[in-house]
Amino acid sequence: MFRESDNTIAPSNQDLNKPVVDKEQPAERTPFFVDKNAPHNEVDFARIESAVREILEAVGEDPDRDGLLETPERVARMYAEMFAGLKSDPGRHLAKVFAEDYDEIVLVRDISFCSMCEHHLLPFTGKAHIAYLPSGKVVGLSKLARVVEEVARRPQVQERLTHTVANLIEDRLSARGVAVVVESTHSCMTMRGIRKPGSLCLTSAMRGAFKTDPKSRAEVLGLINRAAS
């Protein structure tokens, strides 16, 4: 029933030669290098750099010493990269789909990501597991990972990230069922405050059959738990 590799469980007869929708341009790769001089860049680098200098001075540091001289610029580039998903539409990665007479679970597991907690602006990192029940069309498996990557690049809480990914897949693929399980470690719990390294936050979002049918829910959670073990 399934073709299984290191990262996916998917239909073995998936035919990528029968496009149903291909009206948009090929999806762009999520940028990891940020050009602060690019005319389309909406990040105010100067304001971030000024704010970082203020923070350094406020904690008693000298922002003009050798080790910190370029830190404000580095931090500005980092924020531009980490928050690149704010102005983008991650759903565009799901625009191209393929006709496929397959109605069982498609699961992509262990999609690594890094996002930023909106409460302390500290990173949380982990893995997402995505499953869906197709309704006559499937999407390229890598596109699910691109959705996670792009949704992650914004300040947020893990709960919102989980629901955003689930809603996108349900809406854009008209999936009969969607399950998204996210597990991550939060820096705001491990390096400050309660300081509990190793603690793990687990969130889930169920849609369609995975939410309403106990048997379908149990099946997909069993596959995800096997994948995560």
From Swiss-Prot:
Quaternary structure, from the entry: Toroid-shaped homodecamer, composed of two pentamers of five dimers.
Keywords: GTP-binding, Hydrolase, Metal-binding, Nucleotide-binding, One-carbon metabolism, Zinc
Swiss-Prot/TrEMBL catalytic activity: GTP + H2O = 7,8-dihydroneopterin 3'-triphosphate + formate + H(+)
An annotated GO BP: tetrahydrofolate biosynthetic process
Record has Zinc as a keyword: yes
Pfam family, one: GTP_cyclohydroI
Metabolic or biological pathway: Cofactor biosynthesis; 7,8-dihydroneopterin triphosphate biosynthesis; 7,8-dihydroneopterin triphosphate from GTP: step 1/1
Biased composition (Polar residues): 7-16
Natural source organism: Rhodopirellula baltica (strain DSM 10527 / NCIMB 13988 / SH1)
Stretch list, region Disordered: 1-31
Assigned protein family: Belongs to the GTP cyclohydrolase I family.
Protein name: GTP cyclohydrolase 1
Enzyme kind, highest EC tier: hydrolase
Keyword Aminoacyl-tRNA synthetase: no
GO cellular component, one term: cytoplasm
Gene3D superfamilies: 1.10.286.10, 3.30.1130.10
Binding site for Zn(2+): C117, H120, C188
SUPFAM superfamilies assigned: Tetrahydrobiopterin biosynthesis enzymes-like
UniProt GO MF annotations: GTP binding; GTP cyclohydrolase I activity; zinc ion binding
E.C. designation(s): 3.5.4.16
PANTHER family: GTP CYCLOHYDROLASE 1, GTP CYCLOHYDROLASE I
